[in-house]
């Protein structure tokens, strides 16, 4: 049993989805069952995790395998309810930057912040859809 930086326990049998770093080709999300070596590797990666990269490690407890996040749902309050619990406080831009109470569209908010272009925004949504395949 390994503990992540934020204190979440990782154990054998949990599933891990890993994405490649920005700039590499996007492989389909690989579903791995955690082993002792992988537990340590995931815990180390989570310590180095940065919201500026495209690399996320999602750990799903066995019971929550069928709980997935659907980027095609554009209503932000629904997305927050559907988002699986992450084992690290990973900043999922741009969803976390969007003010659902604002009158401006998501596109306008994204452009104003200048943090992420619409093209990258779509790419992230596509990558996330690979991260969370429907069972």
Curated annotation (Swiss-Prot):
Q: Which GO terms describe its cellular component?
A: mitotic spindle; nucleus
Task: Give the protein name, as stated in the record.
Answer: Uncharacterized protein C31F10.17c
Organism per entry: Schizosaccharomyces pombe (strain 972 / ATCC 24843)
Taxonomic lineage: Eukaryota, Fungi, Dikarya, Ascomycota, Taphrinomycotina
């Amino acid at each position: 049993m390994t503990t992540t930086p934020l204190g979440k326990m990782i154990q054998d049998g949990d599933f891990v989805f890993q994405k490649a770093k920005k700039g590499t080709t996007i492989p389909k999300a690989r579903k791995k069952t955690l082993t002792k070596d992988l537990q340590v590797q995931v815990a180390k990666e989570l310590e180095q995790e940065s919201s500026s990269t495209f690399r996320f490690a999602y750990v799903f407890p066995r019971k929550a395998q069928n709980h997935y996040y659907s980027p095609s749902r554009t209503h932000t309050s629904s997305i927050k309810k559907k988002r699986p619990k992450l084992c690290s406080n990973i900043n999922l831009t741009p969803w976390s930057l969007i003010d659902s109470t604002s009158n401006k569209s998501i596109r306008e908010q994204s452009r104003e912040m200048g943090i992420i272009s619409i093209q990258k925004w779509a790419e992230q949504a596509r990558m996330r859809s690979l991260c969370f395949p429907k069972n």
